[in-house]
Structure formats: C-alpha cells, structure tokens
Amino acid sequence: MVRLNHAASYFMPIFCSTRPHIVILSALFSISLFSLFYASSELLLHQYDDPLMFKPNSQDYFRTFLLGLFSPFLYYFLKTFLFNINQRFLILNLIVDFPINDVFMLLILIGLAYPQVQDHEGGTIKHKECSWHIIPRQAYIFGISWALGEFTICIIGNLFNYQEIADPNINSGFTHQESANTYCNNNDMSHNDDCGCSTEYRPNVVDRSDITLSKCIEVRNDSSSISNNVYSSEYHPIKPLRSSSSTYGSIRQQPHENKKQLHVPDNSQDDTIIMMNPIDNSLKLTTLDTGDLSFPIDEEQPILKKSFGYTWAVPNENTQNTTKSFTPIKRFIAFSTAYQLVTGLLLMILVVGSNIMLTIGESLILSMYFVYVRGHEGLFTPVVNYFGSRTISNFILCVIIPFISLNFLINTSIYLRRELDDWFNNSQGEFEDDDENTISKRVATNQEYQHPLSANYISMDSPDVINSSPGHFGMNSGQLLGNTTLYYGSLNGDDDDMTNDSALLRFCKKLVKNWRALARNDSFVLGVMVSWSLLVFVTGILSTVYI
C-alpha cells in the first residue's frame, strides 16, 4: 500500500462503519482537514518581487497539484502491479514505503523545478537565464497533494479489510450479518440462503425431521462442484423437497410448487445470478489467503482487546476451531457512545494531519536546493543560500541521505513492532508482560501454529517428529518463523543479560527490549508520529520560507 497504510488502524474503522452518518461525518472532517491545509498555503509568498525571477501562474500551480496527487498512484502501480511486492514482507515494505518513496518524491520535485522560459511584463524583457527553480509555495502545495493521493489510496485499499461487528455486551446497532438476518425475517422463511442467513440464526426455518444426511451431502457437493459453479453454461440446480439448497449461490427466490416430486430441475436460469462463496466452495484452492476468511466470529466468543483507540475482536485461542493465521480482515466493535465516535474522529485528524505535515516538510526539505537562484541571494533564507551555492553532490550527502535515513529509522521504530504483533500473534490488541509463565503458556498453546509462509510446517505432534531421533527436532525454517519462543525471546530472562556479553551488546539488548515495550503503546506511537511530523514540518518551513 502507501505509507499511511501503516497507521490505517487508527482511522479506518470510522470509514468502514455500517452507519452511514458516521462515514459521511468522517468524510466531511477529512475534506475540511485538507481544505484547511490548502487554505494555509495562501500565507506563503505567491511570487518573488523581482522582474527576473520566475513567476508561477495558475497553470503552474495546477500542474503542481496534478503531479502531487497522481504521483502516489503511479508509485503504487509500480509497487503493486509491476514489481508485485507482497504485504507479507514487512521490512521490505517499510523500505519501499519510506526511503525509496522519498527518492521518488525527489525525482518528481526535480521535474517540477525544470527550467522554463517566461515572457515578462510588456513582452520587452526576456528571461535571459534559464535555471532550475521552484518557489516554496509550489513545494508546499505539492506536499499537500501528495498526502491527499496517499490518503485516497489508503481509504480505497482498506475498505474491505475492516469489518464492524456488534458489541456482545450491548444489544444495540446492526452488523452486516444482523442486517441480513433482519431482512430475511421479513421475507419467506423457506428461502434463507438467498439472503445469506443460515439456520444457526433462525432455527425454526426447516423442520428437523426433514433434514437428512443425504440432503446435507447433496448441498455440499452441489456448492463445491466447479463444473456447476464455473464451467457449465447450462446449470440446472436441483430443488429438494422443502429445502433451500436449490437456491444456493443465487439471489433469486424460487417457489416450490410441486411438493410431490422430490427433485424438479429448474430450466429458467436466464436471469439467475450465481454468487460464489470461497469459504465452502472449491474455489478456495485458488487463493493463498482463503484460510483467513474462515474466522468463526459468530461461532465462538472472541477476545476483545483495546488498541489503536478502538475495541477489536480477535480469535479465541482456547477454541479448537480457531484458525491461527494472519487475518487481513480486522474486526472492530461498533461505536456505542458519542465519546467513542469523537475519539475516532480526533484520531483520524491527528494521524492524517501528521501525515500531511510530514509530506509538506519533506517536499520543502527535498526542494531546498532548487529554491536557490544565483544572483538573488537576498530573496532566500540563509539555509537555502548555503546549500544552493554549493554543488548538488554536497546537498545530497549533507541533506538528502541523512534525512531519508533518519526518516526511515524513526518510522520503522514507530510501526514495525505493531505490525509484527498483528502478523505473528493474530491480534490488534495489547499483550501481557513477557514473563516466563506467560511465554511458556503461549508456547504450549501455539505449538501447532502454522504461519502462512510455512507451507511445509511440521507440527510437534506429527508422527514424523515423534518417531524422529532424540537429537533431531524436525524443525524447518517455516516452523522457526512461527516459534513464539524465538519471537518473544528466551524463556529465561536472565539469558538475555549474560555476564560474558560486551557492554555494547548489553546496551543494544536493553535498548531493543525497551523499544519492544514502548512500541506496543498507542501513546508512544502517536507521540513519536506527531512529534516527528511536526519537527519535519517546522524544519522545512524555517529552512525555505523567508519570514
């Protein structure tokens, strides 16, 4: 995705709510936020009071807006479709989203500063010297437009990655499933499959005496047949007596008129729409992430954990049927109070506003060298005059490389820990202290953990492992990835502070341990995010804008 996607959990729930007024309110607040930053650009100097300086007009600003808005789309296209970078590779995605993305932004800014010949007042004076030049207001608008493009990509790309569910403790609000159940209750009770409802929620739809094993097997075979669902153009479903399996995969309700005949082929299929369910269909073999779709949220009591300012429903590890794999669909509890809604809106403003300030500051810092024009030093700040009067290589070594590296390190320290927790622990919530008892319990409960990347994972209770020699544990690289002990550290905390380690190594271990503890807290993530964005924004303004 884009850089903002690493913090999407802080604001996507308000855009994925099932209540339209919350989504509309969120959209209005986000539009107002970007409009406020665009309006703030009027405070900057529109053009220099010098007849020989480049004076951008409305077309130049429109070109700046278009370059800033659509460049993230181009970068996203190259990243996703051309290079096909998988979201599973966390470190690689951080490298692509920050240092490489900053270099790409620098290239676009260089193209924006390309020399232009301009006719001056009266057409008598021509611009004799063509130089690379961009004014700070152009870089400012470019940064806002870039943030707007990233925000648009993030919203569109995550609309189906978040799902709102009802609070188990509060009988208010509707989820998607409850809405479907309500709709089905208002229609014919014998056609439950057309609305997406199951007998689990409406137990009195079909008499239990009519449910037989053969009918269940027939429904299962009919739904799992590729020939009936995909390749056959003359699909005639079979209608069992007093059963709704004949309408599987269809939104069309078909009456059962002939009750004496057990199977009646239906030949009127011209306007029938076949809808596939990859969970109970043979098409689940065509995707690597189908296991993630089998999250039995309605068949178990999920664990509720608070994080990112919301309450999340995560699979219950004590349930045997729980799928222990990374789940891209994050389920959050619906808003039940006005305070929760206001908190979500404030989080959205804080995170999105921080990203806008970060991109504005980056564009101002990266374009600092091209603001300078020789012979007009009195129009620029001392920082612009210092770096602009020197070579481009000096600017790259002293400003570009240190800034890009520092930006990558800080953002990695902000997001990496939370993403590792989401990936390996199947959770969006807070975790207990990593004491010996807790880790031992996690090792025992996650002994059969299978990571999506480990296709050849060998379970510890597998006969191959049990029959292996005492010196062979049968562990492969995929099993090591899912090993909770390796992720959390040694079972004995004293092993991390061995006396024979050097002082530097002990310091690094202690630093990493403190970072792991801090990076789990939302206050740390939001605090560092806002502080760094504000620092970059202020640095860019003071360095390029002559106050």
Curated annotation (Swiss-Prot):
The keyword Membrane applies. Residues 242-253 have a biased composition (Polar residues). It is a multi-pass membrane protein. Keywords: Membrane, Phosphoprotein, Transmembrane, Transmembrane helix, Vacuole. Residues 1-19, 86-89, 161-340, 416-523 are cytoplasmic. It comes from the Eukaryota. One of its GO terms (biological process) is negative regulation of TORC1 signaling. The modification Phosphoserine is found at residue 225. Residues 41-64, 111-139, 362-394, 545-547 are vacuolar. The chain crosses the membrane at residues 20-40, 65-85, 90-110, 140-160, 341-361, 395-415, 524-544. Residues 237-271 are annotated as: Disordered. It is found in: Vacuole membrane. The keyword Zinc does not apply. GO terms for cellular component: fungal-type vacuole; fungal-type vacuole membrane. This is Uncharacterized membrane protein YDL180W.
